[in-house]
């Protein structure tokens, strides 16, 4: 899996962020994958994919200040989040009991929740289910500080103030 991130002005609208994320993807596909004229389509649940035979899998995300994409020969998902206030009830709707305990015991519960959120969103994008599947259906653990979920290779980092996560089928 290759991940690509680009800083953008924080004042961009959602449409401008969307367009910049796709511009990044098209540039990456041309320059690094040799795909000059990609045709992007979407599944019924909204997962973007490249039309054609033997095309790589793609995922895109954007948030205030950055756009990103992931490209892989396997199913892939990427998510970026700008830090924001989160209600406690959001964690209860998204996380398993073990994940909630981890969040509550963290020195920075808001940051820990956003870590789980971006990881779970990247997994749902990888699966192609988006928000149609309950995030409580799977539990992320951390082994030696690295996120883990059977069947997936997970990546997480704080990119400046942003939370960035990616998932790829193992």
What kind of feature is each model-predicted range?
Residues 1-170:
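Core catalytic alpha/beta fold that binds nucleotide/phospho-ligands
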